[in-house]
Every structure is written in structure tokens, then in C-alpha cells.
Amino acid sequence: MSSSESASSDEETKRRAPATSDSDSDSDAGPKPGKPLSTDSSASDSDAEKPQAKPAKKKTLTKRKRRATGSSDDDQVDDDLFADKEDKARWKKLTELEKEQEIFERMEARENAIAREEIAQQLAKKAKKSSEKGVKTEKRRKMNSGGSDAGSPKRKASSDSDSEMDAAFHRPSDINRKHKEKNAMDALKNKRKEIEKKNAKNEALSIDAVFGANSGSSSSSSSSESSRSSSSSRESSPERVSEKDKIVKKDVDGLSELRRARLSRHKLSLMIHAPFFDSTVVGCYVRLGQGQMSGSGSKYRIWKIVGVEESNKVYELEGKKTNKIIKCQNGGSERPFRMQFVSNADFEQIEFDEWLLACKRHGNLPTVDIMDKKKQDIEKAINHKYSDKEVDLMIKEKSKYQTVPRNFAMTKANWSKQKELAQQRGDIREAEQIQTKIDEIERQADELEKERSKSISAIAFINHRNRSKIKDQVLSGQLKIEENSQDDPFTRKKGGMRVVSGSKSRLDGTLSASSSTTNLSDGGKDKSSSLAKPTQPPPSTQIKKKTDISSLHDFDLDIDLGKLKDFSTPESSGNKRPSISSSKGVSLSDYRMRRSGGGDAGSSTSAAPSSAV
């Protein structure tokens, strides 16, 4: 009995399943939320009822899958709104409220998808109907238009209809759209012509009403001419305005046009501290380096300045310190740059082509009138005459980047004056603040002085040590200063001539000494014996010889006895006398005898230089 009952229950479920499924499909998945509830209730039943429900469920699932092959949503989700067994197991673990919410969301998503499909089908039908209507209107327009088709209208109409039917059948959507646009343009032109005709008629009627209909041909001609001129002026005025707008708003397409708004590094340095720097620079173009190319040269690009910002680091620009950086744009990219990387060279054609391509791609190409305006701004900024207020602002701007003042004395004097004024006003707090600033300036000055003398501190220490050592030796008596009586060739001497005055005997002695060098005799004593006892003449005679006028004009050799000491070498032969000619000079013994001789010897020797001279 149990088997028969189960079989009968299976048959009943099979009969009921198609009816319920058909009614459910008409109502867009109406009973589907009931299915998981039935499964939930079946899960809560006894174990005896479970084996009876499983085969019926499998059969209903297969039937529903076969019926649901037409819809695109049922490919991934089955009738129970589950993708696979894991999804179903996950759903079973949820609470009742979460289960209902999950089922509702899945049903809503399926309904939305079905609604989208229906809307898409309706739109496709409407597009098809509109295309058919467009074809019919074209046929009617061609059939109504006369002219050259009057010869054989039936044949041409039939051939046109056949070709139009074929074109309508094989015509894609873009061709149909072009035809629609063309028809719309023709309709607009016809409407404009009709409006112009109506306006002309209305103007003519108004003139007739004012001046009368029988005013003559002149009035009619003048009215027609006025209407024509007014209509022509109306037609020409917007064209002229548009042409002017086109000329004014012409885009930059040449390198010469872009060069008008170019800024170099030198121009930027001229107005870096000016109060109008930001407004002048924004909108101009600069040439910036982008590193090395594959070859030997550097890579440069053209950038547009879109803003000015301040950075934390201070750098130098043409000898001027600043912390300003420029925000530049090239196509769709923006980057901040220091102005020290801006090139002084002009733009090149390759760089301009790259910049033009990037601007066209991103749609930010400038116009010629903007270039002219920026050129005027640059010239105005460079040739600007600064007022006292602007100069004060520039000085403040420069002082921001100076950590140490240049002129310590001047700054200290200014602070001292302000301190005195504060004390006179009785503002003790301000006077104390100024005093701290003065102390800071003095400290900075001392540090700079130490840095300057740091390189020469070692040499200064050595010099100071040597001076102190010599001073101690002189004071203690260890060091004695000896005066050298002999002439030192390395000491400086006075080169000026001095007038020598003295007795006649001294002058005669000097003359005899000078004449003895010229008159040299052949005889003499032994050279070795004469050189053994050299005597040095007194310093007074040497001074007289040098200062004597006659000795200055003597071209003969002046024997220096001090130097003969060094070159003297005693000979081995005892009594051999050298054979000296009279032209080479006399021996030392003869020279001594003549020096020690009386007035007769002096007079005899003094005759020689007079004859020689």
C-alpha cells in the first residue's frame, strides 16, 4: 500500500506541476518564493516523508528547466533561484528573515532583467517602424518631385521603388541616420526660405499701408531695395560677426605664435621678487629639460605655467634666492618645477610639434589673442617703474631668504635707534626684545669672524710664537745683535748720489787708488807671499771710491780684495815669478808699495789715468 500511495502521489504532483508552472510564468515568477519555503518546511518534516518528496522534486526541476531554456536569466539560475548546491547550502544556514530577503532580492533582479528585455524589443520594433516610415516618405517625395523624371514616370517609379525597397532592406542604421539628417537639413532650409518670404511680404504691406498703394514705382522699388538691403544686412551681419570671432579666437598653429608668450630663466629672475610676479607668469610658456636623450643631447619639452607655489627649500635663481616654484602643464599632466631648470634657449620645431599634439589630444589648445595678451604682460612687467611701496615689498621679500644680515654695523645701529625710541616711550618690553636681537646679531658677527680667521689661525699662531720667543731672548741677553761692517749684497742700499766733501789729501789718495788699477807693471813679488797677508782697505776709502765721480766713469776692473781671498791657492814653486804683461795689472806687493808711498808716488801714478782718459 505504501508503494501504491507513493506512486499516486507522484502522479498527482506531475499533473499539478505544469498547471502551477504555467500560471507562475504568466505572473513573472510568482510562486518561486514559495518553493524555498516548501523546501524549508520539508526539511522540518520527519525522515519518513523525505524519500517520498525527492523523486517528485527532481522531475519538476527537469521539466521547469526544459521550459525555461528561452530566457537568458535561467542559464545561470535554476527555478529554485540557486546557482549550485553550495549556494543552496549557504541559503539553508541563514535565518528565516535572511532567507526571505535573499529570495526577494533574487526575484527582483530577475524581474528587472525581464523588463529590460521587453523594453529592448519594443525599442527595436519602434526603430524598424520609423525606418519604414522614412523610406515611405522618401518615396513620396521623389514621386512628387517633377522635372527630368517626366519622360518615363512609371518605369522610374517602379525601378526607384524596387531599389528603395532593396536599400531599405539592406541599409544599416548609420546610413539611415545620415539620410534622416539630410532630410532634416532640407526641411530647415525650406522653412527658412518660407519665413524670409513672409517677412518680405509683411514689410511690403506695411509700407503700402503707410504711403499708399498708388505711390508709384519709385516707392515700390525703394521698398523692395530696402527690404533686400535689410534682409541682406541681417544675413551678412551674423556672418561678419562670426568671421571676426573666428579671427579673434584662432588657435595657435605656428611656432612664432607660441614664442610670443615664452619666458626664459633670465626674464623670470628679473621679476622674481616683484609683487605682480604671479599674475604675469601664469599663462606663459617655458622650456624645461627632461633629462638626456638616447643620443648626446638633452630632452626638452614645452610646458604651460598654470600656478605659482612656495616650497620649503630655498634655491638660487640667477644669483637671487627664492623658494617659489612654478606648477606647469603639458597636455593632461601637471608637475611642479624649480625655475632654475628653465632654459634660456628658444623653442624648437620638434618640441612644438609634440606640444601641439598633446594639446589637441586633451583639448586645451590656446588661442592667438591669449598669446598677444601675455606678450604685452611680459613687456609691461619688464619695463615696469617701481614705486616706493613696491620697493619696500621687494626688500621684505628678499630679506625673508637672508638668515644673516650683510651689514652688521648698519643693522645694529638701526636696532639701537629703535631701542632708544622704545626706552623714551617707556616701552620696556619692546626694548628688551630689541636688545635680544642686537645680542643675536653680535653673536652671528663673532661666528663669521671665527670662520674667516679659521684658515689662517695656524699661521698666526706660529708667527706669534716666534715673536714672543725672539722677544724673550733679546730681553734676557741671550741674543746679541751684531752689526756687519761688510757690505751685504742682499741688503737694500740707497741708490742716490751724495756730495762728498773733504781735504785735498783724501781726494788725492782716492785718485791714486783708482789710478793704480789701470797702470799695471810687469814686476812684482811672489804671488804666494803676497796673497798670504791680505789686508782689507778701510771702509771709508771704499765709500769714497764709490761716491767719487771719476771712479764712476772708469771702465777698468775694480779688484775686490775680499773676494781674492776665496780664489787664492798657494803654489808649490817657491821663487818662480810669473811673467805678467803690463796690460794685465800689477802684483799685490807693488800695489801696497804704491799705496803706502808718498806724494811722489801718488803723483807718478796719477799721471796714468789722466793720459788713459
Curated annotation (Swiss-Prot):
InterPro entries: Plus-3_dom, Plus3-like_sf. Residues 72-81 have a biased composition (Acidic residues). GO terms for molecular function: DNA binding; RNA polymerase II C-terminal domain phosphoserine binding. Residues 55-68 have a biased composition (Basic residues). Residues 569-586 have a biased composition (Polar residues). Residues 175-209, 425-462 form a coiled coil. It comes from the Eukaryota. Residues 215-235, 510-521, 602-613 have a biased composition (Low complexity). It holds the Pfam family Plus-3. GO terms for cellular component: Cdc73/Paf1 complex; nucleus. SUPFAM superfamilies: Plus3-like (SSF159042). Its main location: nucleus. Residues 252-383 form the Plus3 domain. It is found in: Nucleus. GO terms for biological process: transcription elongation by RNA polymerase II. The keyword Ion transport does not apply. Keywords: Coiled coil, Nucleus, Transcription, Transcription regulation. PROSITE patterns: PLUS3. Disruption phenotype: RNAi-mediated knock-down is mostly embryonic lethal. Embryogenesis proceeds more slowly, with embryos displaying defects in the positioning and shape of epidermal cells. Residues 167-176, 236-247 have a biased composition (Basic and acidic residues). Residues 1-90, 121-247, 485-549, 564-613 are annotated as: Disordered. Component of the PAF1 complex which consists of at least cdc-73, ctr-9, leo-1, pafo-1 and rtfo-1. Component of the PAF1 complex which is a multifunctional complex involved in transcription initiation via genetic interactions with TATA-binding proteins, elongation and transcription-coupled histone modification. This is RNA polymerase-associated protein RTF1 homolog. It comes from Caenorhabditis elegans.
